[in-house]
Amino acid sequence: MMIDTRFPVYSLLERAADLLVHILGLLALGCGVMWLVHTALLSHAAVETGVTLLYCGGILGTCLSSAAYNFCPSCRLKGGLQRVDQSVIFIAIAATYTPFILLGGRGMASRWFCGLLWAMALAGVVLKMGFFTWSRRFHVMPYLCVAWVFFLCPDPPVWRLPGTTFPLLVLGLVFYCIGVVFYMRPRMPFSNVLWHVMVVLGAGTHMAAVGALLLYCARTPPMG
């Protein structure tokens, strides 16, 4: 009984709806990953291919870890999966911004800033994996700090991302922030389901933004 109280308890209908969201989300994002990898490989450029594979790995990793944690029965293993699930989010955030920073900027400032972003993400992983109970007092703030630090990027070309790339990037962030509102209200019916719906929408929108950037890079000389 003590183990059960460590984790949120949802109704059968909520769990069924959440399972449906995870299945549809994995299928949709899986198709998106295949499209992105195909598009990146057509460029025959190491940077485009590398950042795309990194991004796709981060997105799939967070989807799979979320499914593993949310649908594992309450037991000792679930506690470990919870740490992994909350840690991988930092990796996914850094992996999401990497294509925009390195392909959008390509200057030395972008490279240093990308390194700073990953250092923050890895610090978040250490925080969650090594100091999980203590880290919970900060709730979602570490994630928001890593997510919004992108807008401090000092390389001007990053702010001139082509076409629909930047609007899609911002829209994805809006979806995530709406999701955080649901996440912060665990007693609201279907809050966990709505949180995951917003995550899928945010990830899908960012995936479209990465795709738009890859298509632009394939048609034009390197930026920056």
Language-model region placement:
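Multi-pass alpha-helical transmembrane bundles in non-GPCR membrane proteins
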Residues: 1-224
